[in-house]
Amino acid sequence: MQYDTLIQPDNGQAATLIHVTDKSRFEAWLALQPDAVRTAVKAQKFEGGANDIAILPADKTGEWSVAAGVTDVSASGLWHLAKLADSLPEGTYRLADYDASEAMLGWMLGQYRYHEYLSEPKLTGPRVLLVKEPARIAMAALQATATALVRDLVNRPAGDL
């Protein structure tokens, strides 16, 4: 996998918006949302808990956004977006009011798959995250590539090394 393609600089290109919240900020966030979004959130039983996601309707037909719960919005963490990257369909995403600098590596590693011994691997397209701080992308991609190599070695049977 080319990890350096999973995070791209945000140049205003089309992307699905991700709203990040946590349990303590959830009610305030929800109060600012339109009725259709509040109804969708309630129907999906989304409460802003860590690793919870909800698909939200948008004003235009065919468009949508995502609500994602993390442990603590104010303390960006490495793994905050990892499960989200694994759960979303392929596409391009942009974070609303959330600093992804600490979570870039987790976004990349959330898409790691070991397919070596699968007869029919289930391949999915990439989930690309757009970020405002492109200077950190290269280092996060190098760390993801190194971590994936270690994971590959751990997952490979000893007799095949």
Pin down the residues of each PLM region.
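N-terminal hydrophobic/helix-forming segments and targeting peptides
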Residues: 1-161
